[in-house]
Amino acid sequence: MILGHEASGTVLEVGDGVEHLSPGDRVAMEPGIPNPRSRASREGRYNVDPDVRFWATPPVDGCLTEEVIHPAEYTYRLPDSLSYAEGALIEPFAVGMQAATKARLAPGDVAAVVGAGTIGIVTAMAALAGGASRVYVSDIAPEKLEKLAGLDGIVPVDASREDLAQRVAADTDGWGAQAVFEASGAGAAYGFVADVASPGGVVVCVGMPTGPVQFDVVAAQAKELRIETIFRYANVYRKAIDLAAGDTVDLARLVTETLPLERSVEVFDRGAEARPTDTKLQIRVDGSR
């Protein structure tokens, strides 16, 4: 099957009745196609529609090909200020947007993100855009944290040398972070996320562990924490594009290297190595820039 679910490109043709797009438009594509008549879609939760057809999810092919056919309602024109590379990164950024939306951040809140991979970084960006005054981002790989240098409002925490909960507590007079995002997918993280959160705060489960995890419910109850989960995203793609087009979000810094389509196997092999110095490896189809 064809892989790939993060894409941007150029419109070649449009069907009858499509008025917001024209051939030649540069676009980003939301990869999940729900059943518009499902209850989930009608309630605005189309991301959890059991019938959703999502790129590169068997048996549905992905977008790593020169041409795709995609519904116009899930195809968004890119502003001139965004490159094709940034357009393809709208998809992971939408995950961060969904997480920040579910957190219900208030202006000035302190946030913390566990995991400095792509999803962790875009979640931190979305939290800042959503009103957080600062975001602590922790990871056990210091190489990943180096990519955060120069990002205003982000405080890197090397988890191999420093305890996240203790650092946040020290900087907040013992109160904690109003929003904690678990974005690593590591089951062990659920052993301490409640310690990082402030009383009345929220823990948002973003990363997806490979199996069941242990979570101290009593610790969460003692602080009256709110627990939120996300699955992909819904109704945030246009907002994600608008934010990325401004000055507050820099998605281009996530791209480690771009290689041509004929070197795709090399890209996937390198991705499987999980080098801590790699954030996003992109594959370019001829004609994109």
List the predicted regions and their residue ranges.
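Residue-level marker of beta-strand positions
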Residues: 6-8, 26, 40, 67, ...
